[in-house]
C-alpha cells in the first residue's frame, strides 16, 4: 500500500525518472559516466527516459567526454559513484568550471540511513563523514544539492539544471540509493524549466547602451574582439548581427576560435598579443576603441599576458557586467545590451581588415623540405577542413598551431586553453563526436600530441563501442613539446615511451572497424588530405603525423618563454 505522502501526489514519479526526464527535456540524449554500486539502480531508468548510456573507461575520461558533448550539444550529464568515482572525475569538472562548460554531475551516494549512522562503508574515508566529497565539489560547482528528501527533491533538481544552464558551469546532485525509487510529484514535468536569462533592469540597460554608443560613435577606428565567453554564454547571434550591422574589423582570441564566421569579410584573424600575425597586432593595438566580448585574459590565451591594449580604450561585455573604460555596471548581462546596441547603432566608419587566408607562407611554398613542420602543416589543415566540422585541439602544439588556420564557416572549435589538462582532448573528442552523431553526423577532427594521448587513449575504445568515426591526428614528436620549451629540453621527464599508435584500436576490439595511417613527409600528408575516402570519415581513422622534435608554432615558443620566466 502506498504511504500517505504518495497517495497525495497527483502523478507519482520516482526521483530518478523525474531527474532523467528533465535531462531529456533540456536536450541531453546521452549520459556519460562509469557504473558503481551506488548508482546502478538509477541507471536502470535511462532507457525509459530516452537516454543512451555511454559507459566510459574511467571517470576522468567520462568528465572530459561530458565536457566535449556539452560544447557541441549545449549541456551534458555525468554520472559517477560516491567517493572514488566522483573524485576521479573532479579534475574534469574543475576544467569545465574554469572554462564555463555546463555539466550536470550526478553522484550516486550510499543509503541515507547508512550516512546518518556513520557506517564504515567502502569508498569512504573511514571517519563517518559523508559530506566531505560534496564539500570538495562546492568550489567547482555553481550549486551542490543532496536529494535526500522527497519534499524538495524536484525543486532542487529543477533549480540545479537552471543554474547549470544560466551560468554555463557544472552543478552537483547527490542521489542516495534509497531515494532513487522514492515518489515525488510528476505533474511538474508538464511545465518546462525556465532557462531564460533574468532580464536586465530596463533603465540601467538603456543607460549602459547610451554610454556604449557614445564612445562607439566617437571612435575613429574601433574593432571587435570576441572570446570564449561569447560562445559559452550564447551571444553568438548577437555577435554575428553586430558584425553585420557595424561592418567593424573583427578578431578572435585563441579561446574564441569558432565564435565568428572566419569567411566573413570583416574577419581579421586571431589576436593574442605578441603571438599574433603582425598585421592583426597592429590593427588591434592601434585601435582607439575595442569592443571586447566575453574575454578570458589568461596567460595561454594572451601569449603570456602580452596584450598591448589599455582599459581606457576598451568596453568589456560579460555575462554579469559591462565595463566601459574604467566604469563598471554590475548585474547587467551582455546579451540584452548587445541587442539594443545593434538596434540603435546607425552608421559606423569601419577600416578594412588584414587579408587572412590558408595560403602557405612564401618560404614554405618555395621550400624543398619534406619534413612536416608546423608552419607548413596548419595552413594545409585549413585548406582541408570542411564547413561545419568540429575541430578539437589538445593543450600543446596543436592548441597554438590552430591559430594559423582560417576555418570554413560553421566550424566548432574545442580546446582547453585556460585549464590546460593534457589528455583532455581525447575524451572531449568522444563526447563531441557523439553529440555530432546525434545532430546529423558532422565530421569530428582531433589533433593531439603523442604525450597527451597516453593519458586518455582508452576513450578510443569508447568511440569504437559507440560507433563513432572521428579522424584523429597524432603529432608524433617524441614527448612533451610545450614542457621542453618551458624547462628541461633534454631531460628524460619530458620523454615518453614510443607506441605503435596506429595499431592501438586493435587492442580495443576495433579490428576491421578503423583505418590507421603513418605519414612522415609532406607529400604523404598532402596525398592523404586529397583522398576523398579518407576525408569522408567512413570509420574511425588514426593518423600518425611525424614531426621534428624541435619544431613548434612561433606562438607556443613566445608563450612558453613567458611561462618559464614567471616560474623563476
Curated annotation (Swiss-Prot):
Keywords, alphabetical: Decarboxylase, Lyase, Magnesium, Metal-binding, Thiamine pyrophosphate
Binding site for thiamine diphosphate: 397, 420-422, 451-452, 477-482
Protein residues bound to pyruvate: 37, 123, 483
Matches recorded under Gene3D superfamilies: 3.40.50.970, TPP-binding domain
Necessary cofactors: Mg(2+); thiamine diphosphate
Entry binding sites for Mg(2+): 450, 477, 479
Catalysed reactions listed for this entry: a 2-oxocarboxylate + H(+) = an aldehyde + CO2; pyruvate + H(+) = acetaldehyde + CO2
Assigned EC number: 4.1.1.1
Taxonomic superkingdom: Eukaryota
MF-aspect GO terms: magnesium ion binding; pyruvate decarboxylase activity; thiamine pyrophosphate binding
Subunit structure and binding partners: Homotetramer.
Protein name: Pyruvate decarboxylase
Upper classification of the organism: Eukaryota, Fungi, Dikarya, Ascomycota, Pezizomycotina
GN (gene name): pdcA
